[in-house]
Amino acid sequence: MKTKDTKAKLFGTDGVRGRAGEVITPSSVIALGTSAGIHFRQHSLTNKILVGKDTRRSGYMIENALVSALTSVGYDVIQIGPMPTPAVAFLTEDMRCDAGIMISASHNPYDDNGIKFFNHYGYKLAQEEEESIESYYYNPTSLQSALKSGLEIGSSKRIDDVVGRYIVHIKNSFPKNLTLRGLRIVCDCANGAAYRVAPIVLSELGADVIAINDEPNGYNINKQCGAMHPEGLAQEVMTYRADVGFALDGDADRLVVVDNKGNIVNGDKLIGALALYQKQIGKLENNAIVATLMSNLALEEFLKSHQIGLHRCNVGDKYVWDKMREHKLNFGGESSGHIIFSDYAKTGDGLVSALQVLALLIQSGKSSQDALNPFEIYPSELVNLKVSQKKPLEKINGLQEKLDSISASGNRYLVRYSGTENKLRILVEGKDYKLVSEQVKMLVDLCQKQLNV
């Protein structure tokens, strides 16, 4: 988080994030919390804000700074301790709060941290709302003038029993005519926010649960475990001869699955299998789903073969959700493991996704290896080309003709500049790896000549 005089953009694709104690400091968090409080009070309904966090040690520092800021502008703060990001989204609406705040850097190492905001309805903030908060952040006069005194100063209280509400909510997403009895599941909690909740949900539904990485110490979140490092989970699945393994990330909004043979399930295969299952049980709204620009062409063709439409969007679960709302859809996801079932959650929820996978396995009668391997992923090649200038793509001579030739061959391409680096990302995918490789080289050679690489 930059200092006030730089006027840099605070919000990234998923809230505000940075190294704790260097970028995310007590003073910057107080300024951000005060700014958010001013913004939310403009349309206040209940004068309450919910604050949750993951298991990072720096969460204490940030939480206290937020409480100080929010109470200083008159808000009453409810602190719920370590809880998954989707739990904060759910509980914000369920407990009728004006807003919810999650302190987490998701899958990042322990020394990073971040802050995510949810509105009264449990949705992530729109860009206009983020810009409103930023406008206050960079205006010290508005921050000072918003401070309350006397009886107008807010209060704070810690509530530890809200975990039960979330557990009931999650269990209600699982079909009531099914049980997990007879299933052995290894659950990697990433030493993160779901270390208590995940094993309880699975065991209460009848599963034999082996929980791993469920002992957070403030420094071991995501450390060689969880969704970013599922190799350890794969070994445990084989050791315990489990039916399936689930790996969550630090704030439990992401899910990676390991099948009964120890294979890490490709994210696009998981999306495809779940989409088809939702259609088969009559729950896929408008017979279409959302995936990102990075999802493999094989997923698109698999869905098409089952008469399921696909709408693509930019990378980021916020964009997945926006596209779902635009087309009135109830299922979408990213190959990285952020999957949204909007019938049950308004953001990616690793536990909801895990329960839908389990329902699929039970009703199919197949092993996880067979049920979650619905098609083969096509070969792809991605090149990140460093450039000295970001010349408009339409002004690169001959590029469109090359792209048209790739489309004519039946392959898919993605050519776009990075939003944060001086890089041009070139992706091609198709059935024949040799042709894919040749087409990538063709694009790289052309762009290198015209972008002063």
From Swiss-Prot:
Which sites bind Mg(2+)?
S106, D249, D251, D253
Any single GO molecular-function term of the entry would be: phosphomannomutase activity
Q: Which keywords belong to this entry?
A: Isomerase, Magnesium, Metal-binding, Phosphoprotein
Cofactors demanded by this protein: Mg(2+)
Q: EC annotation?
A: 5.4.2.10
Please provide the Gene Ontology terms (biological process) for this protein.
carbohydrate metabolic process; peptidoglycan biosynthetic process; UDP-N-acetylglucosamine biosynthetic process
- The protein's enzyme class: isomerase
Kindly give the InterPro entries that the UniProt entry links to this protein: A-D-PHexomutase_a/b/a-I, A-D-PHexomutase_a/b/a-I/II/III, A-D-PHexomutase_a/b/a-II, A-D-PHexomutase_a/b/a-III, A-D-PHexomutase_C, A-D-PHexomutase_C_sf, A-D-PHexomutase_CS, Alpha-D-phosphohexomutase_SF
Q: Which residues carry this modification: Phosphoserine?
A: S106
Q: Which residues cross the membrane?
A: none
Q: Which GO terms describe its cellular component?
A: cytosol
Taxonomy, superkingdom: Bacteria
Cofactor note as given = Binds 1 Mg(2+) ion per subunit.
Function of the molecule: Catalyzes the conversion of glucosamine-6-phosphate to glucosamine-1-phosphate.
Similarity-based family? Belongs to the phosphohexose mutase family.
Q: What is this protein called?
A: Phosphoglucosamine mutase
Species assigned in the record: Helicobacter hepaticus (strain ATCC 51449 / 3B1)
